[in-house]
Amino acid sequence: FFLQHPDVFNKVIALSGVYDARFFVGDFGGDEAIYQNSPSDYIWNQNDGWFIDRYRQAEIVVCTGLGAWEQDGLPSFYKLKEAFDHKNIPAWFAEWGHDVAHDWEWWRKQMPYFLGQMYL
């Protein structure tokens, strides 16, 4: 939602996500609704200065673990990071350890940690 509406939010924390819609639907062709919800594609093609400026002013955290059940999301995590770097959008892409699983136990630790880093 943040990438579509950076005028509404100026902070975002994304935990353990899959950021490429192909993981869920395969090749989505020209389906605009799916494209709009595939962040790793959407950000690569976003060239509107209004959006880019707001992304650059926002606080963005994207975090993944490297443990159980996180492997499916890692390719899109790195693809999204590459897109942000290419667009010079500052964001904190955090990789937690190999013991960090795709699970509530870890999200309950990560969310307060990152909120504290954002001074919220």
Role assignments for model-derived ranges:
Residues F1-L120:
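Non-catalytic cap/lid and distal C-terminal segments of serine-dependent acyl enzymes
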